[in-house]
């Protein structure tokens, strides 16, 4: 199986499952509702929902292609109640079975042609290392269902958490590793594991990933909440080594900030300061776990594309002026036109004496304050050193 997504890109951002503003909806149902119908009516209802969700998936992928979003995470309920003991079904047995399969495969063809990666992230009830055999049985069944759809659409990632520790992490991780043997090849080769915000850190999971050949989906928010003895940079480096295809990581920000009472809760948007500097420029997929969904992804995309600079101008009277901008040429023109700063307005013309790139606006503001606090001699030294 070829897991590579074409065409190759550098950093790509991923949208997770649903939309905030776009009128693209995935449909679901309940076991209670299906039980209220006779068998044929329930089968027809499920068939209709599956067709609608295949069409919604194509619409989602089309939006991603148009918006320049490089990855889409598919909802685990794309085939509603697929593995339920009573109401579960095989797609082939539904009234529109062949058409459902055809439409999902068309989604896979579209995604491949447009270079859009797809992934799955099963719900938290997937626990491969549970001490309860029935929980493991249901987890395996759910992973197999998602692997079936993943094969249709060309998704290369089915991501899960490590599960519980049950008072003994080594034994729990050993059970996780043993139960991998229960998975089919199409599920096993797509399986990834993610560090969580309570139990398993990157340091806990990396040995299992290396021994079992499972890629680590590094979640930097979870790592900041559930820390170990390795840095973000080292965790990134070690996680990258577990991948034989394009790595996939997660980013999110705490809704109440890192000093808030519940830092695990996700914000509507990503604070650009939370995006690891070492991720920039990598050939990497970063799924954006933010409540504002596509709006948050597109905002982060714009922010990552921005270039911020701290600069020093030498004015006509010999004085120095320090500022920040995300458009250096335009800002210099504004200064010389007398529309940028009251200080430089009476000291024209000005020339650019020093510039320093920063990853985002907050970093630029911080650096600006540091440079402003320097003595005149120290600023001149900075200018001289930059020209050497």
Predicted feature residues:
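Short, conserved beta-strand edge motifs with alternating hydrophobic and charged residues
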Residues: 161, 192-194, 216-221, 250-252
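Active-site flanking residues adjacent to catalytic metal/cofactor-binding acidic residues
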Residues: 120, 193, 218, 288, ...
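Multi-pass alpha-helical transmembrane bundles in non-GPCR membrane proteins
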Residues: 169-180, 191-194
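Active-site groove signature of glycoside hydrolases
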Residues: 153-167
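Short acidic, Gly/Ser-rich segments with clustered Asp/Glu that frequently serve as metal-coordination loops
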Residues: 200-201, 221-227
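GIY-YIG nuclease catalytic motif and its immediate N-terminal context
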Residues: 305-388
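Histidine-centered catalytic micro-motifs
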Residues: 118-126, 216-224
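Alpha/beta catalytic barrel-like cores
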Residues: 2-117, 124-139, 148-153, 182, ...
